[in-house]
Each structure stands twice: as C-alpha cells, then as structure tokens.
C-alpha cells in the first residue's frame, strides 16, 4: 500500500507539484463555491424553516466536517502507534488526509436538490412519467428498465441515467462540469460514495459490490472524467477512494442524532420522550443483531447527559444534546477508526463493500436506533409530511412548466438559445436558467461526435440534464418563489 498514489497533487489541468499548496487550493475553491453557499437555504429535515437554530444542509455539513476531522486524526494516531507495521502516512500525507476529509465532508451534500429526498423523488417520478408517454422515447424507456447495452441502441441507457437523479451524482457533476472547480482528483474522489454510473442497473444483493453500487454515484455525462480519475489514482472501476469511507462514517454519526435534536428544538418531541424511544429502539436493534452485551450503554449515556443538563435548567434541551453527543461520538469514532485499520487493505483498494459503522455491532445498534427513532417519530410527523408534500408539488410544478423546452425539436430549441422572438414563452423560461448551466449544455452538445450528433437522443439527453441542473440547483426558497411566479400564485 502506497498512500502517495491515493493522495497526490494531480488535477485535470494547471496542477502544482506541491501537495500542501494543492490541498490548500482545493479548500479555497470549495469554500468559495456558490453551490456550497446555497446549502444555507436547503433543507436538512424541515423545508423553509425560519428558526435558524434548526439545521440547514450547510450547518449539517459543518458538523460532518468536524466528525470527519476527528475520525481522520484518530486513524492517523492509531496508525502511528503500530510499531510492527511500516509507516503508511508520513506527516505531509497525514496533514493532507485531514484537509481532504474535512472538505469532502463539507461538500458532500452540494448536489442535493431543494426539499431533500422528496425533491429527488419528484425529479425522478416526473422524468419516469415523462418518458413513459413520450411519443419518440416511450419504447426506449420500457427497454431502460432492464437489460445491458448490446452495442446498438444506446437511448434506453441514457434514459435510465436521466430517470435516476441522485444528489451524490449531481455533486460530481457540479464539481466537474457546472462549477468547473478543477479540484485534485483525490479531493473529488473523496465524495464518490457510490460507484455506479447512471446507465447501469442496480445490482442485486447477491452481486459483488452491491453496497458500493447501491445508488448512482455519477452520470453518463461525467463518465469519461471518472474513468480518468480512477486511472490517475489507481482505483479499480467500481471501487472507492479510501477517504470516501471516512466521509460516509462522519455523515452517519452527524445526521442520525441531529434530526432528533431538531425535532426537539421545534417542539415535536420532548427530551424525556426521546430517551424512552431510544432506550426501546436500541434494545430492539441489539436483539436483531443477537448481541447480549452493552444493553445499558444508551440508557447510561442518556442518563449521564440528562444529569449534566439539569445543572442548567434554563437551557436543558440544548445542554442534553451537547452532552449526549459527547457520550456517543467518542465510541462511534473509535469504532470507525478500528474498522478502518482492521480492513485497511480492502479500504485502500476501495473494494471494502460496507460502511464502517454497519457491522452488526453495538455501535451499529446505536446509529440504527437513532435513525429508526427519527424515521418513526420525526419524518412521519404531520408537519414534516406536509412540508414534504409541498416540496414535491413545487418541484413537479416547475418541471411541468419547463416541459415546454423539452417538447421542442432540436432545431427549434437552438432558435430559443439565440432568444428568437418566435418563441416568446420558451425564451422567457430559458432566461430564468443561469448562464453557467446553459453554457454546460452548449459545450456538451458541441463536443458530440458526428455519429452522436446524428442521433437526437444525445442532444436531448443534455437538454434534460440542463433542466435537472436548473431545478436541483435551486434553494428551497427559490423553488417556492419560482413556483408561485410561474403559476401566478400571490
């Protein structure tokens, strides 16, 4: 294992030989990226939330960043203690690892659309419905639901790609195509959580790499870039970069407790209710894993946090979650570190087909208990469900209006791009789309081969991508305002 292969200064262009300078450059590019700033107005659980104490995607990402830093430091410390092993990380690569992990964590959600997973569902449902009845592509859509590419008609696979919108894949598209951040390959690879291209079918549970390919990790539009990235970092196709495992664990630790805390902040649950729910769910998870030890761990953690929180009754709920987080993060980080080091060979090569915190251990039971309480008692709350339905309706409604641009033949759409007066409605719709997205569309179409240009599906693929880029780039508030404007709701 040579981590200098996985952590280096290579980037698509204008690369610098110095690793420190390259990693610092990545930090600046990411922190100054508009897509990152938009996370402050994208939902974590509660869309269009006015209470600033409730998490947005940005504040969640900051918490993930801290967890990632903690795990990375813990891994470096434990590796340095292994005197019987050759040194895997020198000080230069150890420092780079921490920065790469931090930036992976802070930008891991930049591809998520407005209204979170309901926004994703709305986009996918809309495009599935659109293609299923499309006069030209309905047959290709039917073929897209199964089968592998036979070297003839590629349309079904491009349609499959378009009907599998995924925030993780959109993040790769933002980095490479839309914002053109020109990050180091290792920094981009650090957020490649899933390794399946959108043109591939989801593998069965019995298939190799079924976990790594559980969701779409990148689109066909970025496939050549991912091939290039894997070549530069010596990553086998379908495998991960080692840092992606750390980022994933940091995210798992952060969101499972944060969602419950936000529910308490909004008055949907009380601290005492949370304690009882966690106690019952944790025991249930332990039994499902057939674990008899550590049954009192979560109860003791809650009691300790509760006892310390009562010293400041005026800020009881906030203090409780501060102390509970401390009680939980340390064992979870320690476990993630142990799993990383115990499986370091497979993790180095990116073939480890599991999450660090998912191994049927009591630590796994902790995170599962937190997730299940959130799922059963936060996400299903009437207020949350109402907001999710509104988000679904808003996203679908905007797509309905922009269908005009998709229904045009290619030649007529080209007239629209020059703001032709013959299409006043379509031109006004197009003008609302940011220039960077239109530029990305034009560049992609201009780079098509002659054979691809002769097949209308390729231009249409990038036109659909243009609409998805526009919709998914909106904040919750912008999507809400756009919907009201287009449907004349005052």
Which role does the model predict for each range below?
Residues 341-443:
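Substrate-recognition/cap regions that form aromatic- and gly/pro-loop-enriched pockets
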Residues 42-52, 373-378:
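A short small-residue
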Residues 297-360, 368, 380:
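Long, amphipathic alpha-helical stalk/connector segments used for oligomerization, subunit docking
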Residues 1-20, 24-27, 427-436, 442, ...:
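Extreme N-terminal flexible tails
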Residues 36-40, 132, 136, 180-184, ...:
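Intrinsically disordered or highly flexible coil/loop and linker segments, enriched in small
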Residues 1-19, 27, 31-42, 51, ...:
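Sequence-structural signature of the catalytic-core scaffold of metal-dependent phosphohydrolases
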Residues 416-489:
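C-terminal amphipathic alpha-helical interaction region
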Residues 63, 249-252, 328, 332-335, ...:
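Charged, amphipathic alpha-helical oligomerization/scaffolding segments
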């Amino acid at each position: 294992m040579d981590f200098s292969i996985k952590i280096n200064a290579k980037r698509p262009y204008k690369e610098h030989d110095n690793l420190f300078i390259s990693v610092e450059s990545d930090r600046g590019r990411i922190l100054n990226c508009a897509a990152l700033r938009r996370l402050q107005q994208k939902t974590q659980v509660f869309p269009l939330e006015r209470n600033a104490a409730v998490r947005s995607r940005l504040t969640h990402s900051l918490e993930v960043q801290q967890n990632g830093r903690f795990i990375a430091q813990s891994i470096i410390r434990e590796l340095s203690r292994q005197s019987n092993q050759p040194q895997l990380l020198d000080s230069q690569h150890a420092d780079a690892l921490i920065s790469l992990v931090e930036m992976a964590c802070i930008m891991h959600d930049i591809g998520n659309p407005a209204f979170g997973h309901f926004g994703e569902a709305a986009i996918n449902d809309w495009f599935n419905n659109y293609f299923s009845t499309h006069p030209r592509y309905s047959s290709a859509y039917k073929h897209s639901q199964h089968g592998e590419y036979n070297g003839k008609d590629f349309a079904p696979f491009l349609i499959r790609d378009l009907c599998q919108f995924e925030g993780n894949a959109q993040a790769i598209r933002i980095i490479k195509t839309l914002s053109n951040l020109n990050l180091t390959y290792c920094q981009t690879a650090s957020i490649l959580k899933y390794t399946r291209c959108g043109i591939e079918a989801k593998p069965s549970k019995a298939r190799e790499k079924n976990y790594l390919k559980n969701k779409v990790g990148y689109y066909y539009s970025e496939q050549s870039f991912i091939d290039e990235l894997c070549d530069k970092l010596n990553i086998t196709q379908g495998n991960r970069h080692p840092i992606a495992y750390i980022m994933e664990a940091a995210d798992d630790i952060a969101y499972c407790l944060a969602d419950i805390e936000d529910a308490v902040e909004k008055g949907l649950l009380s601290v005492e209710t949370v304690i009882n729910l966690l106690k019952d769910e944790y025991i249930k998870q332990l039994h499902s894993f057939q674990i008899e030890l550590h049954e009192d761990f979560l109860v003791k953690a809650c009691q300790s946090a509760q006892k310390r929180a009562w010293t400041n009754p005026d800020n009881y709920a906030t203090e409780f979650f501060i102390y509970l987080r401390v009680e939980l993060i340390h064992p979870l980080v320690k476990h993630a570190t142990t799993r990383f080091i115990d499986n370091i060979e497979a993790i180095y090569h990116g073939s480890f087909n599991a999450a660090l915190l998912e191994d049927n251990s009591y630590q796994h039971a902790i995170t599962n208990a937190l997730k299940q309480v959130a799922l059963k008692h936060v996400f299903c709350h009437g207020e949350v469900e109402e907001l999710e339905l509104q988000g679904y309706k808003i996203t679908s409604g905007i797509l309905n209006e922009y269908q005009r641009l998709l229904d045009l033949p290619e030649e007529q759409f080209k007239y629209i791009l020059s703001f032709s007066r013959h299409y006043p409605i379509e031109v006004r719709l197009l003008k609302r789309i940011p220039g960077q997205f239109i530029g990305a569309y034009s560049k992609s179409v201009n780079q098509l081969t002659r054979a691809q240009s002769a097949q209308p599906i390729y231009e249409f693929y990038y036109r659909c991508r243009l609409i998805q880029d526009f919709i998914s780039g909106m904040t919750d508030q912008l999507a809400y305002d756009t919907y009201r404007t287009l449907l004349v709701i005052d």
